[in-house]
Amino acid sequence: MAKHAFLSASASHRWINCPPSAKLCEGIKDESSHYAQEGTDCHELCAYLVEMALGRDVEDPTENLTYYSGEMQNCAEEYRDYVLEQFERSKKFCSDPMVFIEQRLDFSRWVENGFGTGDCVIIADEVLHIIDYKHGLGAVSYTHLTL
């Protein structure tokens, strides 16, 4: 299982509103669910499709994805297309934009031992484009703290 930061970006909605909750939750087993695993599988598929489209040597994870489906494939392809669109757009003002997929992001300068994972980070000169893939049910607001 992936390592999680004590003050993780994904749990910031909780610890910003209730700072003691970070300490109280320490040591409590982080139990996954079907929905969380499906999201993890789709993130893995998304990363693969983007990396392939960028010409990188990556292994197809499809046969190892527990929740793989045609719908998941369609969602991942839409994500890939969006990332590639943003990458192409960034080439209009930067000759060599960089794309990082599933990149560890360290914000420990502001939060002790703080880090998270960026689904897609595009660096194009002075522009930083962060794309956070969301999968599953529920609405995501632009006010969501991880965005």
Show which residues each predicted segment covers.
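Metal-dependent nuclease catalytic cores that hydrolyze phosphodiester bonds in DNA/RNA
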Residues: M1-L128
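Short beta-strand-loop-alpha-helix junction that forms the active-site gateway
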Residues: Y133-Y142
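Conserved small/polar residues in nucleotide/adenosyl-binding loops
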Residues: T143-L147
